[in-house]
A protein has these predicted regions:
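Long, charged, low-complexity intrinsically disordered regions
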Residues: 2-8, 93
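The alpha-helix within a helix-turn-helix
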Residues: 34
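Short, positively charged loop/turn segments that connect secondary-structure elements
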Residues: 37-58
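Short, cationic-aromatic polyanion-contact patches
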Residues: 75-93
Length: 93
């Protein structure tokens, strides 16, 4: 498994774990998953999580495709492949 695939799997797991610790209707920001994975990897750089932001959004898209989560903007469910700007992630309803 390559580093990108490894990061993708880790980010998917982080999204699931973060949502599992929140209320059923709660949302998370993709940056929370990126920060979690960067921390778990022991990155010494304070902003190492930033390079994981697009992979985190891609991980969320894969989870949407599997029916596990929904991506929202301004409180509305959106297509993550066309969403521009800040998004939130919640468990699928």
């Amino acid at each position: 498994m390559g580093r990108d695939e490894d990061a993708g799997s880790a980010l998917e797991a982080a999204i699931r774990e973060l949502l599992a610790t929140r209320a059923a209707a709660a949302t998370i920001c993709p940056s929370e998953a990126a920060r979690k994975v960067a921390l778990e990897r022991g990155s010494a750089e304070e902003d190492a999580w930033r390079s994981l932001m697009e992979p985190a959004r891609m991980a969320a898209r894969r989870l949407v495709d599997r029916g596990e989560v929904e991506v929202l903007q301004r409180g509305l469910v959106v297509d993550p492949s066309t969403a521009m700007g800040p998004v939130r992630i919640r468990r699928a309803r």
